[in-house]
Structure formats: structure tokens, C-alpha cells
Design a protein with these regions (language model features):
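N-terminal glycine-rich phosphate-binding loop for ADP-containing cofactors
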Residues: 1-420
Length: 420
């Protein structure tokens, strides 16, 4: 899709994600129309867009002039037929209710032109949950964005056409983003399927008294080179969002350990959210803003990090990365590409495994405990054993998941490489 070449882009849902995606489209030169069934929500769209643009400008991602110009290309519309008229692409970001989404997509198909691409930005529902609600599945797919990052997961359904995938990849390229076409659908896509377990491991370290918030974040920042740790990230995402994501998970009495973890996390987060500590936007979360402790020049040197926290977080991160690859959702290099695009870090989990050494990683997994379920643990173990059997134990021997001394992830073209 080209700016001004295939009509405007229609965004269904005037919440944060709808506004963020509309802003990205407008910044790339597209005309964007935001539709919402609630007039009150639509009236708040300009303010939401302005706040998001302001944060991007402060971060140095866009200029104030670009933000101002983009805002002029974003319109609001209460009438669905009018919003869809002339649209080349539709992106849905309404609340996560399957029945409502299915009804919406049936309606979108009735009113949109026959060549309009219909996409969902759902974070928790799968393509297979929704795609049969439309008659023409060739033009339906998931196009999943990440707030604050230029990573876009593209997930085709069984009927999605190659032409639709190509147009979506072109669209992401015009946005200046990185597209990751998943081989098959996966709960949490790729990045979220890794970051979720990392955040859970971080909270459990503090809940169980193994480390402090600062020790956990310091360990992660030293391991990954990230400018913030898991608790800083939760402040960035918003603590209410994290709390709601755990609250909306169904109870799992058949899995007592997972159910216990859910209850522990909710009890930990409840007083944070209950006292209005919503994160960066509210000025206070796990840290106080605009000058959080982790941003201090001496944060990494002032105190030692927790090695136990380092082991727990690294294990959760890398084991889930391996599981994504072994489940044939995405290749190891594409898993790393997703991580690097989303976090702006220099290395992804498979590069870190090479750095640790695959033999040592196996020991680490044994010490910290495997992923839930023997089947998953077996998959992770087999993947690393197979690599070791080929003499690919990591950086120290010059080959692991990458070839050294010039690993693919260090190339300037890595993020724009093949994603299929």
C-alpha cells in the first residue's frame, strides 16, 4: 500500500492503540479515519493522539512539526459506512470480546469495498477465533502492533491470500516498521510471548523475597543492555494494563501452580494500582517520574545485581524464545529480529544463548526450573542438545545459532531481512 495511493486507512476503536496506529499511518503520509461507536471516545481522540505524539517527540522519534502535520491527517467518524468509504485497509482495536469482534467483522465486510483488507490488532484472541466471521477470508489477517515500538506481527489465516500479505508488508514498510510474518498463530505472537514470562519472573522474584525491585531491574539491564528493567517496563506499559491482563486470565484450578502464580501477581499489583501508581503517565509506578532511579548514571554501579534474578529472568526469556522456534511459529533469527525491533536492544534471546554457551544454558535451565509442563521442557532441551551435537555450542566456538565473528544480528540490514 502506498500513501495516497489506495485510499485512507480506517481504524476501528478510538482507544490508545487505535490512536497510536492512526498516528503512525498519518506520520507516514496516509489519511487516517478513526471510528468508534461511542461519541465520547471519539471526542477524546485528538487529545490521545496529541499525548502519544508528545511522548514520541520527547523521545526524539518525531519532530513537533511532523506531529502537528500528522494530526491534520487524522479524522474522526461516528458513521461506520462513511468511515469505510474509500478505505484500502481497516485495522480493528476494540476491546477483547470475541462475540463483539466477530459481529463487527461481519459488518465491516458488508460495508467495506471488496478489495479492502480487514485486520485485527487483537492481543489475546487468535486469527482462527475470528476469521470465519467473514465470507471472504482472503483479505483477512492479524496486523498486531506494539505501543511504542515499530514491530508489526502479521498472522495470516488459512484463507489469507499472498496478495493480502504482500500489501500488509508494503504498508508496514511505508510506516518505517519491521514486519514479522508468523508461520502460524501463537498466543502472544512473538514478543509478547517472551516479555510476559519475563515480567512474571521479575514479580515473583520480588514477591518471594529473592530480590528487590532495583536488584531485578539492575540484573536485567546488565544482561541485556536495556535502558530499563522489567519494573521500568511495566511502568512504561502502564501498571493498570499489566494488572488487567492478569485479572482477565481465567482461573486454572487444574493447574494449581499457575493458578497460585496468578493470585500472587494480582495480590502484588493490586496495591500499586489501587493507590494510583499507574506508571510513567501518572508520574509514579514502581518508580517516580520524570527522574526514575534506574535512569541515574550510577544505578548499575551503585549496588550489586542479584545473580538469582539474572538467572530467573534470562531463563524465562530464552526458554520461551526456544519454544516459539521449536513450535514452528518463527525461526530463531526472526524471534531475535522481533525482540530487537520491539526493544531497540542490540541482541535477542538466541544471541544471548550463544553468548552464555548452550551447554551452560542447559545447566541454567536445570537450576532455575523448566517451563511448565514436561512436553515444553523436552522441546527446549532437545533444541539445545541438537545444536550441541552439531558442535554449535555458541560464541566461544564460533558458531551457535549464529556464525561468528560476524553474526547476522550485527548487520545493519538485519531488521529488514526476510521474515518468512
Amino acid at each position: 500500500m502506498r500513501p495516497h495511493g489506495e485510499g485512507h486507512v480506517c481504524f476501528i476503536g478510538g482507544g490508545t492503540m487505535g490512536c497510536y496506529n492512526a498516528l503512525l499511518a498519518a506520520l507516514a503520509g496516509y489519511d487516517a479515519v478513526v471510528y468508534d461507536i461511542a461519541w465520547d471516545s471519539l471526542l477524546e481522540v485528538p487529545q490521545r493522539v496529541s499525548e502519544i505524539a508528545g511522548e514520541m517527540a520527547i523521545a526524539g522519534l518525531i519532530s513537533p512539526k511532523a506531529a502537528q502535520d500528522a494530526s491534520l491527517r487524522i479524522a474522526i467518524q461516528k458513521d461506520l459506512k462513511a468511515a469505510l468509504y474509500g478505505a484500502g485497509l481497516v485495522s480493528e482495536s476494540i476491546f477483547e470480546n470475541l462475540a463483539v469482534k466477530r459481529e463487527l467483522f461481519a459488518e465491516l465486510e458488508r460495508y467495506a469495498a471488496s478489495d479492502t483488507i480487514l485486520t485485527t490488532n487483537s492481543s489475546s484472541l487468535l486469527v482462527s477465533d475470528i476469521e470465519d466471521a467473514v465470507i471472504d477470508g482472503s483479505r483477512f489477517a492479524a496486523l498486531h502492533s506494539h505501543l511504542g515500538a515499530m514491530l508489526f506481527d502479521i498472522v495470516p489465516g488459512p484463507r489469507t491470500s499472498p496478495a493480502t500479505l504482500s500489501r500488509l508488508q508494503d504498508y508496514v514498510q511505508h510506516l518505517g516498521g519491521v514486519s514479522l510474518v508468523l508461520k502460524k498463530e501463537n498466543k502472544g505472537y512473538v514478543f509478547n510471548a517472551m516479555i510476559g514470562p519475563v515480567l512474571a519472573a521479575a514479580m515473583l522474584q520480588v514477591i518471594d523475597g529473592a530480590a528487590s525491585i532495583e536488584e531485578v531491574d539492575r540484573a536485567w539491564m546488565k544482561r541485556t543492555g536495556s535502558p530499563m528493567g522489567p519494573f521500568g517496563m511495566m511502568d512504561l506499559f502502564g501498571t493498570r494494563l499489566i494488572y488487567d491482563s492478569w485479572k482477565n486470565r481465567p482461573a486454572m484450578p487444574e493447574q494449581p501452580l499457575m493458578d497460585l502464580m496468578r493470585r500472587k501477581v494480582l495480590s502484588f499489583l493490586a496495591p500499586v494500582v489501587g493507590t494510583g501508581r499507574f506508571g510513567m503517565r501518572s508520574g509514579r509506578g514502581f518508580y517516580t517520574y520524570p527522574a526514575p532511579a534506574y535512569a541515574a548514571p550510577d544505578f548499575l554501579q551503585a549496588h550489586p545485581e542479584s545473580s538469582l534474578a539474572d538467572y530467573a529472568l534470562t531463563s524465562a526469556w530464552t526458554q520461551n524464545a526456544v519454544l516459539i522456534a521449536t513450535n514452528d511459529v518463527a525461526r530463531p533469527h526472526d524471534v531475535d529480529r522481533a525482540w530487537i525491533a520491539a526493544t531497540r536492544q542490540a541482541k535477542g534471546p538466541f544471541a544471548i544463548l550463544d553468548e552464555i554457551g548452550l551447554d551452560r544454558a542447559l545447566t541454567l535451565f536445570h537450576v532455575t526450573g523448566p517451563l511448565a509442563g514436561p512436553e515444553n521442557a523436552g522441546k527446549v532441551h532437545k533444541c539445545l542438545i541438537d545444536q550441541l551435537a552439531q558442535g554449535r555450542s555458541g560464541l566461544q566456538v564460533g558458531k551457535g545459532f549464529y556464525e561468528y565473528p560476524d553474526p547476522a544480528y550485527a548487520a545493519v540490514t538485519f531488521l529488514s531481512g526476510s521474515v518468512i
